[in-house]
């Protein structure tokens, strides 16, 4: 999980979701997991 100030989709399978007021990116590729910090 990468904590970033700005999150963006890296590939086509990345999905942007909101969880507990945080914007997160989930993907089938674990390297693409991101959270806005």
UniProtKB/Swiss-Prot annotation:
An annotated GO BP: translation
Presence of the UniProt keyword Lipid metabolism in the record: no
GO molecular function: structural constituent of ribosome
PROSITE patterns in UniProt: RIBOSOMAL_L36 (PS00828)
Record keywords: Chloroplast, Plastid, Ribonucleoprotein, Ribosomal protein
Subcellular location, record wording: Plastid, Chloroplast
InterPro entries, A to Z: Ribosomal_bL36, Ribosomal_bL36_sp
Coiled-coil parts of chain: none
Location (main, coarse): plastid
Domain of life from the UniProt record: Eukaryota
GO cellular component, one term: ribonucleoprotein complex
Family indicated by similarity: Belongs to the bacterial ribosomal protein bL36 family.
Protein name: Large ribosomal subunit protein bL36c
Encoding gene (name): rpl36
């Amino acid at each position: 999980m990468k904590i970033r100030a700005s999150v963006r989709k890296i590939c086509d399978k990345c999905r942007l979701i909101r969880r507990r007021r945080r914007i997160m990116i989930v993907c089938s590729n674990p390297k693409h997991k991101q959270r806005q910090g």
